[in-house]
């Protein structure tokens, strides 16, 4: 009998600010009940409508650095002047339970994950165009003009990191992008190197061994 490995799949989703990572992730989780999103820790201030423990764990820069020193983070990055990181314990617990864990993180953190977990699945989310990316960021009204220019500059640099990812999804339509994310996860879990072969039960194994022994004995007699 063939079965998938019990441990869940570690999935990394990256993309520039305004690419729609969080929205796509939320939609994907609605139809994929085995997908669990890790909540990141950040030192940035909450935006309007964001909740602590739901969107992020919002902490001070000092508190973040304390967690970093204690080894409590799976990865971390400093982006646009703020720290972002993934708490370690909850991720491992969910993977061991068989849940597929999705990390929505910046490229710096993703590359750290790739070094430590090369078998993880890496997906990059792109906006349909840089023009559309600028439009989306401006609609948020959360950054100053200077901050927007900084994010545009970072986005251009991030595109050069695409070859380090396994898949790219162009987020032209939210529902379609979420469906593609789940389709990639499903296909990836069907790869030969992600499954294991096991015997149906011990009695079947013994029966097989007995038949092999008899066949070898018959060959020796015929010789």
PLM segments and residue spans:
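ATP-dependent small-molecule kinase phosphotransfer cores
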Residues: 40-101, 108-111
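Extreme N-terminal, non-catalytic leader segments
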Residues: 1-10
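Walker A/P-loop
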Residues: 22
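NTP-dependent small-molecule kinase module
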Residues: 4, 157-223
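ATP-binding Walker
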Residues: 19
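P-loop (Walker A) phosphate-binding loop of NTP-binding proteins
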Residues: 14-16
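Post-Walker A helix-loop "phosphate-sensing" segment adjacent to the P-loop in P-loop NTPases
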Residues: 29-38
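Conserved phosphate-donor/acceptor-positioning beta-strand/loop module used by diverse small-molecule
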Residues: 101-106, 115-140, 170-173
